[in-house]
């Protein structure tokens, strides 16, 4: 997955060997038109991966079909269909069926109707967002609590029940924490440790009273526009040193191979001007793709204006990147995680489509500072637009991914895909620096908003219809999701063929023994 991440052009696709060509037939090969080869240009050492981005191509095909033809015409649009159940017919579901004639899952539908006989790959995605990561941390704590309750195992951890985790920014750090291991058997950190980590280190990472204002893409834009300067100041250097110290204390010399399951953590590589994904699957194949977890977390959290960029390299020194924050690359990494599952046939051989996935995406809240009306904004200049543009850029990109993924799931979007997101707050507008304010008052307010978020009704994305308020609260959705995770793990023990065949890392002791043996063999020759 160490690759440049691009949206495929929607017109035509032709394949030649292991490269995918996307061609725009409406214009000649001039700058700005498509006649390009999608390879893995991020790294000179990158291996050849599956060429076509299945989920993204289907998503953008849906978008094209909608705007050109209208999505209601089934002849012009692919939408995944659930298998017919007793009482259904080709003409449509029976009255008792949880599907409407348009293929939409009715609220409250038991997901047992949609459980794939092949099993489902369980995917966790965590957004970036600076101090707003406290909301995702609270969701993780509640999820782990529910897993313990549903499984009856007081030692249950999130890593026991998910097959893949992806994160950006602070979400990437959380993903690394809950999947990191020292003994190859149990995770080092509990879910509550993620929340504590952010609270305890916030004052060292962020400056009280800072006007920088945010984590993720929007926040970075805001800091650059407002300050007119980037890294290099004494305050940024001090914050960077504290971040590196905290990461070293948490992860020591653990690498991507020292994680229990596949993880994906994003950053933006300035040297190749492309998003970069650190992937455990790649690390297990070559040391050239194995990075230290402390360097990965440093890279994904390198928010411009708050922390310095970082030059990081693989454990063998052959692969390098100059990284800034993962939120600039993808503030919501859900689509990247799903695409990884579709492409990783070695570890997920049974996956055929979205019906074989069970995805939980944790947002960090849409916490608007203030609402605007037309009369207020119509005469704004660049200075007045700086803050709203930053917020729109950050939150808007994350929500677009949510909308696109929901469309990709079609009728399975209520049974196989859950997004947990704060839908505003009754506690009043947040301050302009909510994402970077480490003071106790801001931590207290974010904690209260997180508790309020769990009580709010879950908001679902609807096909080209904005949002829909669901019948279940976010806490009820998480509880339901935990039940599904436990059921999936129980069913795996009785299936004839494995749902997941995870590659195992070779221990350092075994690696040294293997290297010593190879050295002796070479000497004998």
UniProtKB/Swiss-Prot annotation:
Q: Where is this motif: GXGXXG?
A: 128-133
> Where is the catalytic site?
168 (nucleophile)
Please cite one Gene Ontology biological process associated with this protein: defense response
* GO MF annotation: an example: hydrolase activity
Superkingdom field: Eukaryota
Give the EC number(s) listed in the UniProt record: 3.1.1.-
Coiled-coil segments: none
Tell me which InterPro entries the record gives. Answer: Acyl_Trfase/lysoPLipase, PNPLA_dom
Family annotation (PANTHER family): PATATIN-LIKE PROTEIN 6 (PTHR32241), PATATIN-LIKE PROTEIN 8 (PTHR32241:SF25)
Comment on protein domains? The nitrogen atoms of the two glycine residues in the GGXR motif define the oxyanion hole, and stabilize the oxyanion that forms during the nucleophilic attack by the catalytic serine during substrate cleavage.
- What is the purpose of this protein? Possesses non-specific lipolytic acyl hydrolase (LAH) activity. Hydrolyzes phospholipids as well as galactolipids. May play a role in disease resistance.
| Assigned protein family | Belongs to the patatin family.
The molecule here is called: Patatin-like protein 8
This protein's encoding gene: PLP8
